Amino acid sequence: AISVIVSFLLMIHQMHRMCCPSIAAHGGTLVKTEADNLFCLFDSVATALAAAQDIVHRLTMVNFVLPEDRHLYASIGIGYGRILNIEDHDLFGDEVNLSCKLSEDIASRNAILLTEQAYVQLTEPSGCLIRQEVSVSGLSLVYYELAN
C-alpha cells in the first residue's frame, strides 16, 4: 500500500513540474495546490486558456515517453469573476467553485472547459469552443468546451 501512495505522490510531483512552466510562461500565479489540483490566477481568460492549451500539449508530449500506467492528464476548468484571494494562498468565489466543478466532475482527460462568464470575456471567441449544457444537482450549468 505504501508503494502505491509513493507512486501516486511521484506522479503528482511530476505533473506539477510539467505544468508550472506553462503557468509562469503565460503570466499566471500558482496560488495553491490540493493533491493533483492546481489553483491559478491569470490576468485574462485568454492567457489562462493559452496556458491550459500549453499544459495539455506538454502532458501529451511527455506521455510518449512514459509507461502507459504513468501517463499524466489534465482536466481544466477556467472561470472568470469576483473572487476572494487571500494573500495568494487561497481562493474563494462562485467562479472558483464552478471551474472546480467543471474540471473535477465534468471534464474528460485533457479537456479544457470554460464557465459562461469566462467565455464572454474572450474578445475573439474561437469557433473551436463548443457550448454545452448539463444539469448538476438540479441546476442547469452552461459551459464551453475547447474542441480538440
What are these regions (language model features)?
Residues L41-A147:
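Catalytic beta-strand-to-alpha-helix segment of the class III nucleotidyl cyclase homology domain
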Residues A1-A50:
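Catalytic NTP-binding/metal-coordinating core of nucleotidyl cyclase/transferase enzymes
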